[in-house]
Amino acid sequence: MNYDVIVVGGGHAGIEASLASARMGKKTLLITMLVEQIGAASCNPAIGGLAKGHLVRELDAIGGEMGLCTDNTGIQFRILNASKGAAVQGSRAQIDMDKYREYMRKVCHNTPNLEVYQDEVTALLVKNDNEVCGVKTKLTEEFIAKKVVLTTGTFMRGLVHIGENKYEAGRAWELPSTTLSTQLKELGLRVGRLKTGTPSRLDANSIDFSVMDMHGGDVNPAPFSFRTNKSDFAPTQFPCYITYTNEKTHEIISSNFYRAPLFTGQIEGLGPRYCPSIEDKVNRFAERDRHQLFLEPQTAMCTEYYINGMSSSLPIDVQKAMIHSVKGLENAKIIRYGYAIEYDYVDPTELKHTLETKKIKNLYHAGQINATTGYEEAAAQGLIAGINACLSIDEKEPFILRRDEAYIGVLIDDLVTKGTNEPYRMFTSRAEYRLLLREENADLRLSQYGHKFGLIDDETIKKVENKRKTIEEAIEFMANEWMTSKKETLELLESIGEEKINDRVLLVDLIGRNSIDIFKFEKLVPSFAHLDNYLKEQIIIEAKYYRYIQKQQKQIEKMKKMLKATIPESFSYKGLPGLSNEVVEKLEKHRPPTIFNASLISGVTPAALDIIHLNLNIFVTNTKK
C-alpha cells in the first residue's frame, strides 16, 4: 500500500501529526500498537499548566485537536497564576482520561484521508542509504510512503522498573518497540536513554477526603479552544484534594533508598528535573518536613485517583507503607502501583527546525523521541512535523515558527539548537518575548498559518480578523486619547475608586493600571462597553502591556535585521571571545551565508548570534577602510 505520510505511534504527538497531514489532503496512515490506546494519558489526568497551556492554545490556533478534545472531556478547569500577569498565567484542566481517549479515537477514525492500523513498526524502509521510503511491520507488511513521522513516546526499548522487578514494556503491561531504535543508531543517529515515572492510583472508596483540603475549579471556567463557544461552555466540574507527606513518610522512603532503582544503578536514564519522583525529592530536599500531594480524579466516575507529587519506582511494599502514612490515605487501597520507565530517545540536535532528521531524508520525529516530557510538548511537535511533512511533499516553504512568534517556536529552537540530556519541559522563563506570547492572543498570532494550511476554516479566520480589528481600533483610540485633570475626569476616577491624575495622561496608560477591571474599563471607555467580556479583558491586557510590547517589538525588529545580515566567506570565527570551541568548529565547517542560517545550526545560541553580529560589524567596518 502506498501513502503520502505514515505516522508511527498514536499518542499525543502522533494524533496531531496524522490529523494535520490528513486535513491537508494527504493520504495518511496512523500505525499504533493498540488502537484502544490512541490518545491515552499515560501519566497525569490533566492537560495544560504553566507554559503548557500556551502550547495547547497555540496548536489550537493553528488547527490542532488537543484544545477541542480537552474542552469536550475536561472535568475541572482552572487558570494557574491567576493573581499574576497574563503573560505567566496558565490554563489547566483535569480530564476524563477514558472520554479523552474515546474522543481522539473517534476523531481519527472519522477524519477523511486518515487510516488507522494496529501493528508494530519494526523497521524503516530505506533507499540510497539515507532516504526513508516506508515502514515494515511485525506482521511482515510493508507500507510505502513519501514521508514517515516517528512519534514513539516511551516505547523504544521501554523498560519498566518497580523495585527490584523490571520488565520490557512501552507503558505498564504494553509491549515495547524493540528494534526501531537499533536501526536508527545504525543509520547514524545519536540515540540516548531517558527515564520518567508515574505514581500509584487509588480506589476512591478507600480515601478519607474529609481530612483533606478541597481544590475546585474556577467559578467561570474558560475553554482551551478558541473554537469552543464560550457562552455555552459550562462543564460539570469535579474537585481535587490536597494532602501532604510527613516525617514518617520520609523515614519510610529514606530507609529504603538502598532498594530504590533510582539509587542502586538499576536505572541508567536521567529523569525529568522538574517532575522528580518522591524518593528523589526526599533525597534532594532532606530539610523539607513535608511535600504537597494532589489527589486527582481520573474520570468523571471518580472511582480512581492519581496521586500527583508521589511518582515512585520503589518496591510495592514500600509504596504501600508510604501511602498509608499520609493523612487521609491510611486505609487506601492501591489499584495500580507507581513505576519508572526507561526508554530510548534520539538527540534532538539531529533534527532540522522542520523536525526532519538531518541525516535521513523524509524522516520526522515528534514527542518524547525528541527528549521532551509532557503531552502538550508532544502534541505541539506532532502538529509541526505533520504540517512540514505535507509542505515538503508539495515542495513548499517549510513552516518554522520564530522564538518571537510562539512558545512552539521556542520549544523547537531549544531542542534542535541546544539539545538536552534530560527530559525537556516548557516554562514561560524559556521565552524571551513572553509578554507578546500570551495565551489569550495565540489565535491572533497564529491562526493565519492554520488557515493557510487548510486547518482553520474561513468562518473561524473571519472571527479572528474581526477580533484583531476591534482590539487594534480600541488600542489606537486609547493611545491617542488624552485624559486631563478636569473636574469631570477626577469625579469619574473617584466614583470608580481610582487614584486621581495631576496632569494629562493617555487613556491607554490609565487602562494599563493593575487595578483596572471590566467595570472600570466600561466607565472609562464607554464607546467599547458593548463588546463581550472576553474581548474587553483582552483589550485591558493589551493596554497593560502596551509600553512593554512597544519595547519588545523594537527588539524583535532589531533581531530580524540582524538575522538578515550576510556573512562574507572571508569572515573567521576563530578567536571570537565568548564562542565555545564546539560552536566555532561548527560555524567554520558549515560557513553559513547569513546570521539566520547560523541560527539554524545546533548549539548556536541567541547569545552566540549576538557575538557573531557584533564582530561581523567590526569586520565589515575594518574591511571598508
UniProtKB/Swiss-Prot annotation:
Q: Where does NAD(+) bind?
A: 271-285
Gene3D superfamilies this protein is in?
Answer: FAD/NAD(P)-binding domain, GidA associated domain, C-terminal subdomain, tRNA uridine 5-carboxymethylaminomethyl modification enzyme MnmG/GidA
The keyword Mitochondrion belongs to this UniProt entry's keyword annotation: no
Ligase as a keyword of this entry, yes or no, is no
Tell where it localizes. Cytoplasm
MF GO annotations: flavin adenine dinucleotide binding
Residue numbers binding FAD: 9-14, 121, 177, 368
Any one Pfam family here would be GIDA
The highest taxon in the source lineage is: Bacteria
For this protein, the record's SMART domains field holds: GIDA_assoc_3 (SM01228)
Q: Which cofactor does it need?
A: FAD
Q: Name one GO biological process term.
A: tRNA wobble uridine modification
Q: Per UniProt, which keywords does this protein have?
A: Cytoplasm, FAD, Flavoprotein, NAD, tRNA processing
Q: What NCBIfam families does the annotation carry?
A: mnmG_gidA
Binding partners and assembly: Homodimer. Heterotetramer of two MnmE and two MnmG subunits.
> Main role?
NAD-binding protein involved in the addition of a carboxymethylaminomethyl (cmnm) group at the wobble position (U34) of certain tRNAs, forming tRNA-cmnm(5)s(2)U34.
Provide the protein name: tRNA uridine 5-carboxymethylaminomethyl modification enzyme MnmG
The species this protein belongs to is Aliarcobacter butzleri (strain RM4018)
From which lineage does this chain's organism come? Bacteria, Pseudomonadati, Campylobacterota, Epsilonproteobacteria, Campylobacterales
